[in-house]
Structures are given as C-alpha cells and as structure tokens.
Swiss-Prot record:
Segments on the Cytoplasmic side according to the record's topology features: 1-111
Biological process terms in GO annotation: regulation of cell shape
Annotated protein name in UniProt: Cytoskeleton protein RodZ
Recorded family membership: Belongs to the RodZ family.
Protein species of origin: Shigella boydii serotype 18 (strain CDC 3083-94 / BS512)
Record remark on domains: The helix-turn-helix (HTH) motif in the cytoplasmic domain of the N-terminus is involved in the formation of spirals to maintain the rigid rod shape. As this protein is anchored in the cytoplasmic membrane, the HTH motif may contribute to protein-protein interactions to form the RodZ helix, which is localized beneath the cytoplasmic membrane. The C-terminal domain may be critical for determination of the rod shape by probably interacting with enzymes required for synthesis of the peptidoglycan layer, including PBPs in the periplasm.
Function text: Cytoskeletal protein that is involved in cell-shape control through regulation of the length of the long axis.
Length: 337
C-alpha cells in the first residue's frame, strides 16, 4: 500500500517539483546545482517552476532536465511522461537560404548596374573629349590654312609690285629724265634776274614739247605767283592740277581696328577686293576703307576691337565660343553673322 501511494504521489508531482524535492533532500542549493551543471541560476529556477524559457530550445531544455535528474539520483524513465508535457519536441525553424541567395543575387545585380553606369559615364566623357579635340584641331587647321593663303597672296602681290617699277624705268625716255634740271635752272634764272626774261620766246619749242604735265605741275608749284607775269603774252599758261590741294574727306564707312594681341585677319569689301589679309601684331591698328558690306574673318576675336561707322562691333558671341569669327558688316545695319 505504501509503495502504491508513493507512486501515485510522484505522478501527481510535476517534473520541476520532483527535482526540487530531491535537491532539498540532498541539501543542495540552486546555486550549487547551477555550478555543477554549468547553468545559470535562473535556468535552474525555471526548470523547478516548470517554465520553458522562450529563448531556449526544447532539445536543450530536455537535456538540462535529464542532467538535473541524474544529479539528484532520479531515474530518467520516471521523468519521461512529464518531459513530454513540459518540454515537447518542436520542429526547429530553419531559416531559409533563399534570403541569402536573394541578397547575393541582388548584390550581383547591383554590381552589374554600377559597372554599366561607370561604363556609360566613361563613354560619354570620352566622346565629349574627342569632339572637343576634333573641333579645336579643325579650328587650328583652318587658321593655319588661312594664314598660309594670306602669306602666299602677299608674296605674289609683292612680286607684282616689284616688277612694275622696273618696266616703267626701262621705258622712260632719257630726254624726259634730263628735263627737270633744265626747268629748275630756268626757274632759278627767272627768280634771280628778272631783266633776262625778255628773250624767253626764243627758247626752242622742242624743249617745251618734252615737258610732261606732271613736271609742269611741279614747276608751277615751286615758282611763286609773280612768275606768271614774266611769261610772254603769246605763251599760254601751263595747266595746274588742283586735285592734290583738296583735303581728303573722311569715309563714313571706314573700318577701324585696334589689336591687343597677335591676331590673323582677312577683310574683303563688296567688290571682292581684299583690303587686308595677314597677321597683325599686338598694339597695332588698321584703318580700312572700301565698298560696304565688309566680310571679316578673325582668327582671335578676343584680340581685336572693331569700330564701324563710329560704333563698336560686338564680338562677344565669338569670344564665348572661342571660335574663328566670320561676320559681315553692312552699310546700314548692325553686324550680321
């Protein structure tokens, strides 16, 4: 009867109560049990109070209970029914590996996207640099070509200018070259001895025929006004050229340019005549006149200041783009591209 009563009493007690009673019978404290089982005191307390910690897996809890039972000399078979209720086996939740694979796939995709972005950026920078270099090279080649053309034209013009005086000097009559001293001597004689002017009609007419109009102009300009009275009544006065005496009138379409640095320039008027083509140095200036409109090509727009009809010409659009300036200056309107 006593054995059956003891068995029923053990079945009525929970696993934790049985372990606590056995510990107290052996005179052990919770601290001692915890040190022997290498557990926390709170874990031993939870086991005796039949509590299952939330952060502790059921497999570990069952192992701790078995170790506790062996320590207090309780057969494990007697605790198995209570273990099924207190710490039932639960399937462990295995974290899916999909998240890792997804993260790896996302990281790989982000890497490809970043690589593609950098590749596109490098391509854009390379194309921009190539375009700028080609444009700059084309401008330099154009300036060089225009400079070569202008130098060739200047050399051809200089050769033609040198050949003209040589031809005129060879075709000049020697008699005409010797005439000016004679006229000068005659003038000097007239100014020194007025009494000798009476025999002037006896001069050989061939000498008068040799004198050219230009030489006559020189003589009349050199002799004073009273010499006209000394000439004989029968001789007609020589014609004088009054065109050289008139003062030149300023052209309203004059083109004035001042240079602050070395600059290549070409100016053409409406007739196609090149008023200037070549290199201008720093601190130089040009004053050109011709038939409007003028066509200008300027290699360095920032190095020149232009005034047309008394007004400055705006070259800021060419200076900003750093390009060769091509513009037309009309007679009655503002400069046009």
């Amino acid at each position: 009867m006593n054995t059956e009563a003891t068995h029923d009493q053990n079945e009525a007690l929970t696993t934790g109560a049985r372990l606590r009673n056995a510990r107290e019978q052996l005179g052990l404290s919770q601290q001692a049990v915890a040190e022997r089982l290498c557990l926390k005191v709170s874990t031993v307390r939870d086991i005796e109070e039949d509590k299952a910690p939330a952060d502790l897996a059921s497999t570990f809890l069952r192992g701790y209970i078995r170790s506790y039972a062996r320590l207090v000399h309780i057969p494990e078979e007697e605790l198995l029914p209570g273990l099924e209720k207190q710490a039932p086996l639960r399937a462990a939740k295995v974290a899916p590996m999909q998240s890792f694979s997804l993260g790896k796939r996302r990281k790989k995709r982000d890497g490809w996207l970043m690589t593609f972005t950098w590749l596109v950026l490098f391509v854009v920078i390379g194309l921009s640099g190539a375009w700028w270099w080609q444009d700059h090279k084309a401008q330099q080649e154009e300036i060089t070509t225009m400079a070569d053309q202008s130098s060739a034209e200047l050399s051809s013009n200089s050769e033609q200018g040198q050949s003209v005086p040589l031809n005129t000097s060879t075709t000049t009559d020697p008699a005409t070259t010797s005439t000016p001293p004679a006229s000068v001597d005659t003038t000097a004689t007239n100014t020194q001895t007025p009494a000798v002017t009476a025999p002037a009609p006896a001069v050989d007419p061939q000498q008068n025929a040799v004198v050219s109009p230009s030489q006559a102009n020189v003589d009349t300009a050199a002799t004073p006004a009273p010499t006209a009275a000394t000439t004989p009544d029968g001789a007609a006065p020589l014609p004088t050229d009054q065109a050289g005496v008139t003062t030149p009138v300023a052209d309203p379409n004059a083109l004035v340019m001042n240079f602050t640095a070395d600059c290549w320039l070409e100016v053409t008027d409406a007739t196609g005549k090149k008023l200037f083509s070549g290199m201008q140095r720093k601190d130089g200036n040009l004053n050109l006149t011709g038939q409007a409109p003028y066509k200008l090509k300027i290699g360095a727009p920032a190095a020149v200041q232009i005034q047309y009809q008394g007004k400055p010409v705006d070259l800021s659009r060419f200076i900003r783009t750093n390009q060769v300036a091509r513009l037309t200056l009309n007679a009655e309107q503002s400069p046009a591209q």
